[in-house]
Structure formats: C-alpha cells, structure tokens
C-alpha cells in the first residue's frame, strides 16, 4: 500500500487543540466558595456568630471552612487569650460539657507540647494576644456539619507567637445551625478583626 502525503491529500479542514483534554469532560477539583464575612468595626463585640447555617447552606455544601484574622482587645495591652468556638448556641459562657479538644503546640523557646481538654463548654482552636499588637491567624474546618448521624469533627491550624494544630469533637449529632467564636476571659474582639466563612459543595 502506497504511503500518501497529507500535504498533498486535500485534507484542509481540521480542528487544532492545545489541550490533551480535548473532547473530554473536564474534571475540576472541589473549591471552597466564600459565603459570608464579618469585619468588626469596633471593639465592643465579644462573640461573633454565623447563624441559619443549615437552612441556608445545608442542601448545597458538605464542609465549612473559617479563615480568621483576629485579636483580643485588652485594657492594658498585655493579655493573652484563647480563641474558642461553640456551636448551636451550646457552650461558651453558657457552660456545658459537649466538647473535647486535642492540640499540638509549638512554642519558640520551649519546644513542642501536647494539650488535651475533655468535657468542656467550647472547642479550643488557638491563641490570640493583645501583647505587642500581635494578631492571631486561624483556619478552621468543620467536617460534615449538616450530617445528623454522627458527632461533628472540627480541625484547626493557628499561628501567632506560637503555632498550634488541633481538632475537637462536638458531641451532638444535630445539624449545625450556628457557629460562634469567642475569646476567653470575656475579652472583646479588637477593631478590624475579620472572620470569613467558606463552603465546599457537596459532590
């Protein structure tokens, strides 16, 4: 069989693709979408709450993520404060024992530490301080917050003058309707503190 040159065969109509995915349905990895942001204009707030979560997002999103840049306001500017979280209005200053937390902590001068808290009224996600103007940064993932067949698991990563990685369990199978953030010692949030909530769509 003779070999025929395409240059002489009259094949002039063709399509050129620059991607190996041509003709195939693209597969896009999941991406978190910004849902809400709260920026505090003044330092008179001690609790920041995101509400109506299940009714607004439960049918669309599988996981929630919070990204936080915050600091506890302090009269003397030299007070350290833990950042804590509670859900569905259960916990916080209202007391209770629905949360259990485990943290790995890296302190610059003291090395590594492990901390555990059980049967507390909040989940502990990290550390914020008013000392020297330091702000705390946090990433908080709430896994399957709208499931009603298992307890809710939360994982967190935070950084300030020390770094922490941890997780906690909220011992309740109810769908999450609200998430609240609060510093301990009844400290208010510093002006300019920012908390953004993202959602990862269900498959």
Stretch-by-stretch model annotation:
Residues 2-203:
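Surface-exposed molecular-recognition determinants
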């Amino acid at each position: 069989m003779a070999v025929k040159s395409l240059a002489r065969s009259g094949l002039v109509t063709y399509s050129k693709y620059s991607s190996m995915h041509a003709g195939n349905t693209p597969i896009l990895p999941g991406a978190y979408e910004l849902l809400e942001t709260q920026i505090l204009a003044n330092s008179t707030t001690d609790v920041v709450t995101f509400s109506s979560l299940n009714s607004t997002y439960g049918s669309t999103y599988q996981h929630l993520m919070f990204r936080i840049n915050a600091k506890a306001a302090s009269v003397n500017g030299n007070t350290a404060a833990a950042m804590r979280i509670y859900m569905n209005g259960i916990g916080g200053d209202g007391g209770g024992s629905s949360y259990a937390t485990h943290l790995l902590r890296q302190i610059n001068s003291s090395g590594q530490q492990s901390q555990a808290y059980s049967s507390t009224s909040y989940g502990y996600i990290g550390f914020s301080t008013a000392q020297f103007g330091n702000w705390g940064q946090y990433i908080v993932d709430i896994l399957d917050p709208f499931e009603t067949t298992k307890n809710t698991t939360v994982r967190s990563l935070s950084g300030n003058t020390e770094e922490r990685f941890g997780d906690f369990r909220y011992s309740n199978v109810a769908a999450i309707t609200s998430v609240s953030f609060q510093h301990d010692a009844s400290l208010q949030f510093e002006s300019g503190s920012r908390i953004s909530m993202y959602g990862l769509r269900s498959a």
